[in-house]
Amino acid sequence: MKVYFFDEVENTQELAISKFSSEPILIIARKQLKGRGRKGNDWENADQALACSFAFSLEKDHQNTSLLPLIAGYEFSSLYEEREVFLKWPNDLIVDEKKIGG
């Protein structure tokens, strides 16, 4: 897997798509200027937050991707052991009724 780190990018998702070939790719940025959320909504990076996008291809037999956002949210929540983390569809991480990631 190729991993790229940037101090600042326009959009991690667009960059991941443009750099993706056949090998999985992870784009991580300290600051994202023009992030997009679900349904094209603007996504703003909080200070001291990371923005990341992961791109990979699926085999034809495994193209049902409906659970992937929830699986990703679960995996990230399992890394956060200090507090109880709740998941909200599709991949939001909620602590003390506040979104901490997604």
Task: Map each language-model feature to its residues.
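N-terminal lobe of the biotin/lipoate ligase/transferase fold
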Residues: M1-L79, R83, I100-G101
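Catalytic palm active-site di-aspartate
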Residues: R83-E97
